[in-house]
């Protein structure tokens, strides 16, 4: 009988230990799942941080190029103005003009390598996203809202507007006002 009681006590102790072990296993599995979840979150956050850092570096690079390019645009404007106001027939300025033409060509080629392109909209429809209207002029020969004259070229850097083109836009001629005789 003492053996039965002893075996029963051992059996109860083993059952209690098994229940404790089951609870402990479940607790450890929950901790493992939480640790895996935390690990995935940390990995995702690290990946997002790397992506954000790369985007910031790209933006900084583009911004630096944008500022530099903006600072160069007046130089291009000056070279183009020099060519526009010099005569190709004048022997005194012929060599200087050729030098300015070559300098401007090299400058434009360099800007193309860095995806800086000119917007010269002469004759095209007015686009408020790329053009800045400086004046409106009546003209019956072209469509209304067409660019008649370009005061200053615009520029795009990597497809993004760096400087709008300053333009004169056409408008339809106004209907003639009736004279006093026509009103009567």
UniProtKB/Swiss-Prot annotation:
It comes from the Bacteria. Keywords: Chaperone, Cytoplasm, Stress response. Pfam families: GrpE. It is found in: Cytoplasm. One of its GO terms (molecular function) is adenyl-nucleotide exchange factor activity. Its main location: cytoplasm. GO terms for cellular component: cytosol. Transmembrane segments: none annotated. GO terms for biological process: protein folding. InterPro entries: GrpE, GrpE_coiled_coil, GrpE_head. Coiled coil: none annotated. Participates actively in the response to hyperosmotic and heat shock by preventing the aggregation of stress-denatured proteins, in association with DnaK and GrpE. It is the nucleotide exchange factor for DnaK and may function as a thermosensor. Unfolded proteins bind initially to DnaJ; upon interaction with the DnaJ-bound protein, DnaK hydrolyzes its bound ATP, resulting in the formation of a stable complex. GrpE releases ADP from DnaK; ATP binding to DnaK triggers the release of the substrate protein, thus completing the reaction cycle. Belongs to the GrpE family. Homodimer. This is Protein GrpE. The lineage of its organism: Bacteria, Pseudomonadati, Pseudomonadota, Gammaproteobacteria, Pseudomonadales.
């Amino acid at each position: 009988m003492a053996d039965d009681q002893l075996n029963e006590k051992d059996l109860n102790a083993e059952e209690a230990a098994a229940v404790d072990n089951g609870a402990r296993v479940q607790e450890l599995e929950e901790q493992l799942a939480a640790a895996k979840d935390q690990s995935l979150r940390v990995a995702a956050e690290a990946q997002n941080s790397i992506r954000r850092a790369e985007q910031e570096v790209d933006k900084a690079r583009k911004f630096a190029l944008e500022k530099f390019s903006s600072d160069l645009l007046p130089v291009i404007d000056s070279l183009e103005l020099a060519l526009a106001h010099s005569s190709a027939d004048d022997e005194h300025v012929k060599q200087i003009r050729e030098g300015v033409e070559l300098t401007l060509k090299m400058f434009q080629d360099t800007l193309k390598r860095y995806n800086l392109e000119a917007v010269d909209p002469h004759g095209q429809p007015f686009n408020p996203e790329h053009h800045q209207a400086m004046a409106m002029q009546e003209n019956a020969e072209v469509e209304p809202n067409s660019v008649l004259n370009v005061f200053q070229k615009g520029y795009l850097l990597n497809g993004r507007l760096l400087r709008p083109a300053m333009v004169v836009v056409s408008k339809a001629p106004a209907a003639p006002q009736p004279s006093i005789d026509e009103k009567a």
